[in-house]
A protein has these predicted regions:
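Short, solvent-exposed loop/beta-turn-alpha elements that line the ligand-binding surface or hinge
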Residues: 25-28, 179-184, 249-258
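Short, glycine-/small- and polar/acidic-enriched structural segments
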Residues: 1-137, 141, 146-149, 153-159, ...
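Pocket-lining segment of extracytoplasmic ligand-binding domains
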Residues: 141-231
Length: 292
């Protein structure tokens, strides 16, 4: 048995373990997964560091570098999402805000500290020289409620969440994660393990990654995967397909490489997530992706 903390229940990228378990792929590799869903990467990472879970799915890259630089027992076992086009920021349809430039003095949402959304809004502020107030709002459902009730000016979400509201013109998108130049085409979220777990149960972690890779293949090659996903979330298969095909090219969730590491390490200092650049030795210890 492996215990997992997973940020954002229902995002396509965070659903690999759930879909793989439901499809019997992890079982085939002799694994049972206990999956706990969190409000965001900050919470996921905390659970891994404290040892209350073995692995964390979708930990924000900046949060991971920050925790590791402060001596936290965290290791990277894979890339979880590369590119940030799935994340979007939105306002109520009748909001005067048309773009990020209109957010001075307004509240701009992210999920939790150290998450990919936190990294991206921090980058927005720097890149566009904004004076918005960054506000942690947890997951997409609570964030939408806050936007619709005018507690927050700009909310965040990722499909399939919010697609209905966008279609019904209740909300409109003002930015996506790719509008943050430092995150475009980079690995933004990671698969992480507690350092102790990786040391003492490496063969189990290796098996998890084998099953994970097999599930990613299944999610794009087998039409059954959309059925499993849509039944779990109680959404239509059409919406499941739109989520996958519109926002997640397969390459974006293949776990084999951390893309843009050199830039990420520099940006972590720029955006004040680490005090100094991590060295090659440190990165060698932090990043231990099991080979295919």
């Amino acid at each position: 048995t492996l215990k997992l903390a997973v940020g954002q229940r229902g995002n396509w990228d965070t659903s690999v373990s759930e879909i793989g378990q439901r499809a019997g792929i992890f079982k085939k590799h002799g694994l049972t997964l206990e999956i706990v869903y969190t409000q965001g990467a900050g919470e996921t990472q905390q659970a891994v560091i404290s040892g209350s879970v073995d692995l964390g799915v979708a930990a924000g890259v900046m949060g991971v570098l920050s925790a590791y630089s402060k001596g936290a027992p965290v290791r990277v076992i894979g890339a979880e999402t590369t590119g940030a086009g799935d994340l979007y920021w939105y306002v109520k349809s009748d909001s005067p805000i048309k773009s990020l430039k209109d957010t001075d003095g307004k509240t701009l949402a992210y999920s939790t500290n150290g998450s990919s959304t936190h990294g991206i809004v921090t980058a927005f502020i720097k890149q566009y020289n904004l004076k918005a107030k960054l506000t942690s709002t947890g997951g997409p459902p609570g964030t939408l409620t806050a936007v619709m009730s005018n507690q927050i000016d700009v909310g965040w979400a990722a499909p399939p969440f919010g697609l209905d509201q966008l279609d019904n013109k209740q909300i409109r998108v003002i930015a996506t994660g790719n509008d943050a130049a430092v995150f475009k085409g980079q690995t933004v979220r990671m698969l992480i393990a507690n350092a102790d777990v990786l040391k003492t149960r490496k063969p189990v972690v290796d098996r998890y990654m084998k099953a994970y890779r097999e599930t990613v293949d299944y999610m794009y090659a087998n039409p059954e995967a959309l059925k499993v996903y849509s039944e779990w979330l109680k959404i239509t298969e059409a919406k499941a397909k739109r989520t996958r095909d519109g926002f997640f090219p397969k390459a974006s969730i293949i776990p084999d490489t951390i893309t843009g590491l050199d830039t990420i390490v520099r940006d972590a200092v720029e955006l004040k997530f680490t005090a100094t650049q991590l060295t090659k030795e440190q990165l060698g210890e932090l990043i231990q992706i099991p080979p295919r």
